[in-house]
């Protein structure tokens, strides 16, 4: 699959067979891959099938600028599924062809707002979302922080054609002593300080959709009440005698593994079963590099419409090999930082990227094991209000910053006390990660 670059005829994918395939600027017939790239030699590289190894191999045909596999220059190497190949300024990804999978360039599902990307993974998620949108069943959106779960919830609501509003709520940001009142409402005098009645978020979403983001943060007693609402389609505000019927579609989202939470008694199995009637998975950005180039172009047009900010092949390759712990939000932040550094536009090389993106992937022969630089992994990244990093993300940041809580707080745009609260929550000791410890 072509991720980045200029392929003759605008082709976006090539099916490999048993016959050798050459790549270059002048390779003849259509079974070969012709690249309109001045950095590519006339006959640059060849991919061939080995009957002995039952694997594809690639070899450099004596090119001027080399062949790179997962960021490392090679002469001859086995190709594995998921590997990135760079020749000049053109980057490919080797993928297995799945039966029934949408082809690159296939029409995207009709959802508003439209999602930016062309990976099969994203397209499958959008197709599923479009199919289940007209129903009234609960939907659970799974995916790590920054993948656009809130945007998908909004798209499902619009496609449902429900007449009411979409009411979003971040469960992690609700005060623990007010969650029930916020969701279900209360009557005047129901508790100390209840000087007036409150309708609650469920009634605010009447005939519409209630989006419960970070649902894994809800306490067990609230989970039980939520389950009853889903089953009875009615609510009882705090202090009320009678129940009120509601017509609300619930869309929930989480970056947690709720199956794991159920197994450890932190999430109700019956609520989990109810929510998983319809599940849409949004994969992390690191697993769908096909979406990087269109997302980059989208953010450049959005944030710097008068700037022409382009990427070199080496810079794109480094981005495709990056782990993207904060996903699409991190990419947007990278574009913003690049536009600030180059307001007039131009081409970004690999040296213009954050240090963590410049090191080669570990494990490929020839990669430098000691290439991890000091400093933050990306430009400063601000979390949205109420957003909470997952334990894995927090541990990764503690490792990157060698246990320096002050630097982590600056990186996330949060107070140090909040970082310490998260560390205690996830039982992470920053001292264990400081230089010279243990």
What are these regions (language model features)?
Residues 103-127, 177, 322, 380-386:
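Dynamic helix-loop-helix/coil hinge segments at AAA+ ATPase domain boundaries and subdomain interfaces
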Residues 125, 147, 169, 183, ...:
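Conserved RecA-like P-loop NTPase ATPase core
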Residues 157-164, 239-249, 256-368, 401-402:
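Nucleotide-binding/hydrolysis machinery
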Residues 1-36, 48, 52-53:
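Intrinsically disordered, low-complexity acidic Ser/Thr-rich regulatory segments
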Residues 128-193, 203-219, 284-289, 334, ...:
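Conserved post-Walker A coupling segment in P-loop NTPases
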Residues 23, 48-57, 64, 68-118:
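C-terminal boundary/linker segments immediately following FHA domains
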Residues 139, 155, 176-181, 202-233, ...:
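Conserved AAA+/SF3 P-loop NTPase catalytic/coupling segment centered on the Walker-B
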Residues 11, 148, 333, 369-438:
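Bacterial C-terminal helix-turn-helix
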């Amino acid at each position: 699959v072509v991720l980045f670059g200029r392929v003759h005829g605008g082709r976006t994918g090539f099916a490999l067979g048993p016959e050798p395939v050459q790549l270059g600027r002048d390779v003849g017939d259509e079974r070969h891959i012709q690249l309109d790239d001045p950095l590519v030699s006339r006959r640059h590289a060849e991919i061939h099938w080995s009957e002995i190894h039952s694997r594809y191999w690639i070899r450099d045909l004596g090119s001027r600028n080399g062949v790179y596999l997962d960021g490392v220059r090679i002469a001859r190497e086995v190709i594995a599924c998921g590997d990135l190949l760079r020749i000049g300024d053109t980057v490919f990804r080797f993928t297995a062809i799945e039966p029934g999978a949408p082809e690159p360039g296939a029409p995207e599902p009709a959802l508003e707002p439209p999602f930016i990307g062309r990976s099969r993974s994203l397209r499958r998620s959008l197709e599923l979302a479009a199919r289940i949108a007209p129903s009234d069943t609960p939907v659970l959106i799974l995916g790590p922080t920054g993948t656009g779960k809130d945007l998908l919830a909004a798209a499902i609501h619009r496609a449902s054609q429900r007449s009411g509003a979409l009411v979003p709520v971040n469960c992690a940001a609700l005060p623990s002593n007010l969650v029930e009142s916020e969701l279900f409402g209360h009557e005047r005098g129901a508790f100390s300080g209840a000087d007036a009645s409150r309708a609650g978020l469920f009634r605010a979403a009447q005939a519409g959709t209630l989006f419960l983001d970070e649902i894994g943060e809800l306490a067990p007693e609230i989970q039980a009440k939520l389950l009853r609402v889903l089953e009875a389609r009615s609510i009882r505000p705090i202090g009320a005698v009678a129940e009120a019927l509601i017509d609300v579609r619930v869309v929930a989202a989480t970056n947690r593994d709720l199956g794991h939470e159920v197994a450890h008694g932190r999430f109700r199995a019956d609520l989990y079963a109810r929510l998983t009637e319809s599940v849409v998975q949004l994969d992390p950005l690191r697993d769908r590099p096909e979406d990087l180039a269109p997302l980059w172009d989208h953010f450049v047009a959005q944030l710097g419409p008068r700037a022409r900010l382009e990427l070199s092949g080496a810079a794109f390759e480094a981005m495709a090999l990056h782990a993207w712990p904060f996903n699409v939000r991190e990419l947007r932040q990278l574009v913003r930082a690049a536009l600030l550094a180059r307001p007039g536009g131009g081409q970004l090389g690999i040296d213009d990227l954050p240090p963590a993106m410049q090191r080669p992937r570990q494990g490929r022969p020839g990669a430098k094991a000691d290439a991890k630089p000091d400093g933050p992994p990306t430009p400063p990244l601000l979390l949205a209000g109420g957003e909470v990093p997952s334990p894995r993300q927090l541990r990764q940041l503690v490792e990157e910053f060698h246990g320096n809580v002050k630097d982590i707080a600056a990186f996330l745009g949060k107070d140090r006390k909040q970082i310490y609260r998260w560390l205690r929550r996830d039982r992470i000791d920053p001292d264990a990660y400081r230089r010279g410890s243990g």
